[in-house]
UniProtKB/Swiss-Prot annotation:
Region (Disordered): 16-64
Protein name: GTP-binding protein 2
Keyword Nucleotide-binding: yes
Biased composition annotated in UniProt, kind: Basic residues: 40-50
Every tr-type G domain range: 170-398
Family under the similarity heading: Belongs to the TRAFAC class translation factor GTPase superfamily. Classic translation factor GTPase family. GTPBP1 subfamily.
Residue positions binding GTP: 179-186, 260-264, 316-319
Species of provenance: Homo sapiens (Human)
Keyword Electron transport: no
Tissue: Predominantly expressed in thymus, spleen, and testis. Expressed at lower levels in brain, lung, kidney, and ovary.
Length: 602
């Protein structure tokens, strides 16, 4: 991570050099060469017919991998050809983990040729047959007319193909919701998930709060989860037409799980825990149009950058401001996104066509940052955000998912509950492997460094029963009569074959983002590594006596309370007051349970 990311934390790091990223990316449809990643500055001369002189627009050449397929036309294929097309569709769906995009009327090299109306109708009919064959559904995203070198109107059509994998109940995407206090995070989620607009006084957010003081103050202090479903046709499924979460899950082919995080600075540790432990696919950064970048906005942006979580931005409360105020806030965001240490390309979304393009480019390039402007009271532009979320594909590919599933089981314990007639229940994310009902696992480390045997009695995802949990999925696991007092946040449940190692001392390569004076041996910080959150003391700074803001070094930390389960390469974030730093674990000094007991005074 570039040390200049510290500027986004509100620190006083010396600014680095380097040019800012270019202008705001204008979201354009498939019919525009500049908006689709085609060659810039290279144009072929088109023929002049009927007074038209059009240049051939291009998409990037078709890639063998990925979930995007180009087809010039699909008119009356032979049976052999049809079977080949079906096999090809299965491959694209597998690459997109259940979603694929077909561009009809496009050559393999990306040239937008287009089809006449009859050919397009026949091609879509064939595509529908292919989808039926594999058990998928298709939705036409958009159509574009291209008239290059032709007197007859010709169109290209972009089609979304969606199929829930056989081993899953629905496609799942986790979105962390960030933003300053009072920016409207919980209100927006209430509007999306309840299906009713806000009254301007926070009515929509009431169902999301978990504590009385949250209802009284209107401010989130804990992590809550809300779900928004989409059926196979891309239609919203929420509590407006479903009474329970189970009904939403049953009716949805794609599920968006929103992780609502706290905006107030006093709850920053909770927000960091939500980002590091719940492994969101991406983040939604909410910015109030009337206040702009204020409070913790810049710090939350810096957290997303430091943890390499892709994010998009929603400018809320546009009903309270003049148009010029909204434009000023957008320009302010664009300047921050382009500055050194961020290097993002803003993409302002103002139409449904823009939303489709933004979803695709956001998935393909980590530098693209879509910006939406909307109101939770009037509902203006709310549909554009829904279109974006419906089309947004999983940001990890099938190969990465398959590799994780081949590893031994590892489940992060993030939440612990006691449920009547069920017993002890833990919530968290499966980092690797596969977990099934009845599996025998070990959980730890305990305060004395031990791992204890347990059995997974049942599994639930989004409040619906589930027999098998796969890597990357979040769920709750019932552990029966296992003693809750033996569990704590930060533990892991792993396969006994893993022979897990624990440590009290570890080393990490860090960048000190901000510190008021000098960072020295003996300084205490709160360390966040995945679902681990514990105070640690700096034992040694290699090759240096002290660190200043913006400097990098390898540092040895020691946990103060109890040993933890860490892995080399894990991302690390530490803070104490205004002191902040990021890095990754480079070495762990493994110890036995006996050594842990001796170190901790047992």
């Amino acid at each position: 991570m570039d040390s200049r990311v510290s500027e986004l934390f509100g620190g006083c790091c010396r600014p680095g050099g380097g040019p800012a990223v270019g202008g705001t990316l204008k979201a354009r449809g498939a019919g525009s060469s500049s908006g689709c990643g085609g060659p810039k500055g290279k144009k072929k001369n088109g023929r002049n017919r009927g007074g038209k002189a059009n240049n051939p627009p291009y998409l990037p050449p078709e890639a063998e991998d990925g979930n995007i397929e180009y087809k010039l036309k699909l008119v009356n294929p032979s049976q052999y050809r049809f079977e080949h097309l079906v096999t090809q569709m299965k491959w694209r769906l597998q690459e997109g983990r259940g979603e694929a995009v077909y561009q009809i009327g496009v050559e393999d090299n990306g040239l937008l040729v287009g089809l006449a109306e009859e050919e397009m109708r026949a091609s879509l009919k064939t595509l529908h047959r292919m989808a039926e064959k594999v058990g998928a559904d298709i939705t036409v995203l958009r159509e574009r007319e291209v008239d290059y070198d032709s007197d007859m109107p010709r169109k290209i059509t972009e089609v979304l193909v969606r199929k829930v994998p056989d081993n899953q109940q629905f496609l799942d995407l986790r979105v962390a919701v960030l933003g300053n206090v009072d920016s409207g995070k919980s209100t927006l989620l209430g509007v999306l998930t309840q299906g009713e607009l806000d009254n301007g006084r926070g009515r929509a957010r009431l169902n999301l709060f978990r504590h009385l003081h949250e209802i009284q103050s209107g401010r989130t202090s804990s992590i809550s989860f809300e779900i928004l479903g989409f059926n196979s046709k891309g239609e919203v499924v929420n509590y407006s037409d479903s009474r329970t979460a189970e009904e939403i899950c049953e009716s949805s082919s794609k599920m968006i799980t929103f992780i609502d995080l706290a905006g107030h600075h006093k709850y920053l540790h909770t927000t960091i825990f939500g980002l590091t432990s719940y492994c969101p696919d991406c983040a939604l950064l909410l910015v109030s149009a009337n206040t702009g970048i204020a409070g913790t906005t810049r710090e939350h942006l810096g957290l997303a950058l430091a943890l390499k979580v892709p994010f998009f931005i929603v400018v809320s409360k546009i009903d309270l401001c003049a148009k010029t105020t909204v434009e000023r806030t957008v320009r302010q965001l664009e300047r921050v996104l382009k500055q050194p240490g961020c290097h993002k390309v803003p993409m302002l979304v103002t139409s449904e066509d823009d939303a489709v393009t933004a979803a695709q480019q956001f998935a393909q390039s980590p530098n693209v940052t879509p910006i939406f402007t909307l109101s939770s009271v009037s509902g203006e532009s709310l549909d554009l955000l829904k279109v974006f979320l419906n089309i947004l594909p999983p940001l990890t590919n099938s190969k990465e998912q398959e590799e994780l599933m081949q590893q031994l089981t590892e489940f992060q314990v993030d939440e612990i509950y006691t449920v009547p007639e069920v017993g002890t229940v833990v919530g968290g994310t499966l980092s690797s492997g596969i977990c099934r009902e009845g599996d025998q696992l070990v959980v730890g480390p305990t305060d004395d460094g031990c791992f204890l045997e347990l059995r997974v009695c049942s599994i639930q995802r989004n409040r619906s029963a589930c027999r098998v949990l796969r890597a990357g999925q979040a769920a709750t696991l019932a552990l029966g009569d296992f003693d809750r007092a033996l569990l704590r946040k930060g533990m892991v449940m792993v396969s006994p074959e893993m022979n897990p190692t624990i440590c009290s001392v570890f080393e990490a390569e860090i960048v000190l983002l901000f510190h008021a004076t000098t960072f020295r041996r003996g300084f205490q910080v709160t360390v966040h590594v995945g679902n681990v959150r514990q105070t640690a003391v700096v034992e040694k700074i290699h090759a240096k006596d002290k660190l200043r803001t913006g400097e990098k070094a390898v540092v040895r930390f020691r946990f103060l309370k109890h040993p933890e389960y860490l892995k080399v390469g894990a991302k690390l974030l530490f803070r104490e007051g205004v002191t902040k730093g990021i890095g990754h674990v480079t070495d762990v000094q493994a110890i036995t349970a006996g050594e842990a007991q001796a170190n901790m005074g047992f």
